[in-house]
Amino acid sequence: MVSDRRLLKKFGKIADKIIALEPQMRQLKDEDFILKTQEFKQMLENGKSLDDILIEVYAVAREAARRVLGLNAYKMQLIGGIILNSGDIAEMRTGEGKTLTGIFPAYLNALSGKGVHIVTVNEYLSRRDSEINGKVFDLLGISVGLNGSSLTKTEKREAYNKDITYTTNAELGFDYLRDNMVSDYSLKVQRKLNYCIIDEADSVLIDEARTPLIISGGTSTRINLYKAANNFALTLKEHDDLDIDLESKQVYLNEQGMKKANEFFSLKNLFAIENTEIFHLIMNALKAQFAFKEGVEYTVRDNEILLIDQFTGRIMHGRSYSDGLQQALQAKENVDIEEETVTLATITYQNFYRLYSKIAGMTGTAKTEEEEFIKIYNTRVIQTPTNKPVIRKDEPDLTFGTKNAALKKLVEDVLEAHKKGAPILIGTTSVESSEQIARYLKKANLKFETINAKNHDREAEIVAKAGEIGAITLATNMAGRGTDIKLAKGVAELGGLRVFGVERNEARRIDNQLRGRSGRQGDPGLSRFYISMDDDLMMRFTAPKTRQRFKALGDDYIKSKMFTRAVTNAQKKLEGMNFDQRKNVLDYDNILAQQREIIYAQRDDILEANDLSVVIEKMQITAAYELIEKHSTLVHGEKTINKKELLEVIDGILVPKNKFRIDDFNNKEKMDLAVEIAEAMMQLYKARISDIPDDVIIVMERKIILDAFDKHWTKHLDIAGKLKSGIYLQQYAQNNPLAIYIEQATNLFNKMKINIANEVVENLANVILRVVEDEEQREERIEVTDKDIEEILFETGLQPSDINNKAINQRFDELEEEFKDDKQKLRRLRIQRDVMLGLVLELERRAEMIISPQNDQQAITQLIKELQNDIDIASITIDQIHQNFNNMVEQINDPEKLKHLVIAKDVLLQLVARMDDIKEQEKQTRKKKKKKPHEDESSKTKIG
């Protein structure tokens, strides 16, 4: 691999050539920049590569930035831009102008028209950078979009269709997952993933890599089980019942713990397959009780569990743990237990960013993680020299026996620096630590600003003022990244910004980020860490005897470069463990990634296809083969097809009636027979859809196939997740857990594809039949007139007095039996039956329309029956209704019932009037013509 020095020398020569074009670029008029952009695009169309035009493109962008922002990029920023275009990580110190550096590769790659994504860690930075740099891109004739969580799908699509899109890493990943859940291709918002520039690349690609992106949906709650698992966890004791690995923060039941679990839940064997759910709940309860701390991984606010970003200290609103861990934490903290979520779609950041054709990133600290960048993302980390030498003083750590002693010394040093007026930034690793330090500062009557998970709304504003005289800022971890701390006038003379770190972080890189807040662009500064044996890192990596010796120091401390190196070595060990953990996440996700790519690619094909017959045909072959397997029995060690059973389940249902005989199944290989059955399936399917418009069919097919894909993919993710959570137990059987997982996940995936095929074939058969029936019913509802009713009565021999459900069904049953061999006549009879039954329904609806919703409908219906006095609706006269009404009125004293009776009379009179109209039409028809009316095409259209 080429060394950084050689690369920087090579890129430095290119940067010199860019700077040499400055006099020429100064001659450009403002309107010339758009013309240059058009010229560059034409050069690419004519076969030039991005590298071929890089020098002139960067020179034009440099001049545009100078005119718009008043910033003339210096050589190191141009070198950073060249590194980014090469698809690598540029390590640039704080204050070295990363925002300006990103303009050059973004402009160059936007010329291809394939889109550029500039990724930030929060929406504030996305908005800020898009507004500032957007003015430069506007002069260049390049469109800029801003993506955010509050945008509609249309707004997101517009943002992604711009030449350059600013977005947060989380929103970018969630948009990708949501795009692969849409039911119509036009609903997608993203284009193909081409090129992205990631700001704070270490935060996105390393720190957040352990947490996958998950889109969840609701499922049933199991509140009592969560509480039971939590109560069980409370009965356990460390060492006696549990093995807790402090280094990896993993919690396991030991042999005694397993015995207790069996007793508590009345189980014979906790690890039996039927107890998978219980085991999963127990493991989550153990994590919640013993591995997660309030104020570190999460906080409780307003009866709700809120997740804390471990690397910035910010609350992650809208985010929750999946697979029941959120509910386990809710049970632990005794807050309302929410509905458990099931994973609908998921991807790790590692596998998401590997979908891009090219990725690049900028950060102040990444060299310590270069091995991971190379192995996971195939990107190098190239350190760019600072524009001015770093003169900040990094002092050795002060190591104490107790946290109390460390914080006392911290307050002394803060008071001393504050008396001089020097600004101070105190960095902590958690909200809990931040609040503890705040109490010490308040006790010393010091005024300070705080940024942590519970107070981050004014983050950028507080960080920007942290360089003012007398400012004291208490920040959780790397809150405020992306916002420079500029020294106020006179601060440099006071020694610059003091950075005091309380407790070392898990990674040297994060410590370096904290140090790097001081001493930007050649400013003076000082950094120092206060370490105690109570710190998490020390508890995990120092021997009890060592901790005891330090505690004997009291308030005294050790200031030793040797011990500082020992702490650094512990961090290196932890970095290796964290890398292994992230690599482990990736190894398990790789199998899902391959499966996800297959599913998403097939999904896209289905969304874009205008003809799905090939897809359906393949599924029919799969379904046919599975049917053959299902109806095969083991005879003398060989599976033999039960031919009679097989014929019964397919004949007339999945294949045309009498298409196969039992003899047709003789002497055939199962796959050959499956192909024959599938061909017959397609034959019947095409016959059933022959009368349905193509545009209706494609929509129906697409929906059925996508529904099956999504349903079974979701189920697969859930099963695979549960499989992974317990796979570590395989190591006790001397098996390789990853190898077992890959094998079982592959089998699950193959089974999932079979289930999809079976469901699609079955649902297509059922739904298409319903569509045919619905289409018939839709047609028969078109323009059904009194003349149509008249013709049906004449054809079928029905009388007006027969207009009730029982008489209609009885007569049509007789006619269908009579014409059972005449398919056309049968079709017409079915339509006529539905028309007549529809007429009865219409008469009933008319009655209901008159009855006000506020009235007692049941009472009125009973009164209508009494008014009819057991006389058929077709025979009763208006006079009889009035007579019955008068008789009933004399017997009613209740005003409410009298009102109901009046309504009932009106309803009945309307029904009788309708029947009289039908009778009159029948008489007129019989007078005109006694033979069957001519059945012309227009009547067929109206009725059928």
UniProtKB/Swiss-Prot annotation:
UniProt-annotated binding residues for ATP: 77, 95-99, 484
Family per similarity comment: Belongs to the SecA family.
Basic and acidic residues bias: start-end ranges: 933-944
Compartment(s) of residence: Cell membrane; Cytoplasm
Reaction catalyzed: ATP + H2O + cellular proteinSide 1 = ADP + phosphate + cellular proteinSide 2
Role summary: Part of the Sec protein translocase complex. Interacts with the SecYEG preprotein conducting channel. Has a central role in coupling the hydrolysis of ATP to the transfer of proteins into and across the cell membrane, serving as an ATP-driven molecular motor driving the stepwise translocation of polypeptide chains across the membrane.
InterPro entries linked: Helicase_ATP-bd (IPR014001), Helicase_C-like (IPR001650), P-loop_NTPase (IPR027417), SecA (IPR000185), SecA_DEAD (IPR011115), SecA_motor_DEAD (IPR014018), SecA_preprotein_X-link_dom (IPR011130), SecA_SF2_C (IPR044722)
The organism of origin for this protein: Mycoplasma mycoides subsp. mycoides SC (strain CCUG 32753 / NCTC 10114 / PG1)
SMART domains: SecA_DEAD, SecA_PP_bind
GO terms for biological process, alphabetical: intracellular protein transmembrane transport; protein import; protein targeting; protein transport by the Sec complex
Gene Ontology, cellular component aspect: cell envelope Sec protein transport complex; cytosol; plasma membrane
GO molecular function: ATP binding; protein-exporting ATPase activity
UniProt-annotated stretches for the region Disordered: 920-944
Full protein name: Protein translocase subunit SecA
Gene name of the encoded protein: secA
